[in-house]
Amino acid sequence: MLVRHILSLVFVTAGLAACRGGTDRTNGGDSPPPARASVDKDTEFGHEGLYTMELSLPDLPSKADPLRATIDRYVDRQKRAFMDSLDAPGARERARELPWDLNLDIAVASRTDRFINVQVDGSAFTGAAHPAAIVDSFTYDVQAHRVIGIRELFADPHGAEKAFAAEARRQLLTALDDQDEPLASDSEQIDAGTEPGKDHFRVFSLLTGPDNKVHGLTFIFPPYQVASYAAGPQAVDVPSDAFLTYLKPEYRGAFR
């Protein structure tokens, strides 16, 4: 049975403690998809100790060179934005008191013969009250040799997003009434954060089975999208039978 999961953000001075290790996600698991980084983290220290940048990247096959190029461009953008923030008035003075930090763990979360899914789990601390979470994903179509977004999987992307929204809302609204750990949110925030057509389902991973097929999708919502910052990012599993009819013909064989 596919159930809702909560991804816990554990913030330390350096930023977000990322999820590491484990195996590819399989259908019916009880924890979020573990990201697998196969290389040591590269750490760069800034001039005068103003900042630290920590980065880990996945090992990818040569057939996934377009995915590697996409990830490299993404990392460059994140680094530029982080460094640009040091040019703001008073930024360097604040960084001397408490050094800033960019932390990016980028790793393969799941793969099949058709797809390689990569997750980004990171944070940027730039002097605010707490680090800003960085939550992203990339899905590579091995046959088409290109990175695809969620809407590119579907002949009727709006219909698919309506199905995602219905299941996400059902699970998240149920979590509001959890007796042990109620979700720190409300129905208005959940509805707004899962509205179709607003790029709300951009970050996702694949629920894969032993048959090398995709059995469902896990949508990951960053802090503030459907719940409070303290609640951390939220993850909702949507089984494939909720959206199979909306898939493009060329992708139906990759799902079950």
Regions found by a protein language model. Give the residues of each.
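Compositionally biased intrinsically disordered regions enriched in Thr/Gly
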Residues: 20-256
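C-terminal motif of bacterial Sec signal peptides marking the signal peptidase cleavage site
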Residues: 16-18
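Bacterial N-terminal signal peptides that target proteins for export
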Residues: 1-7
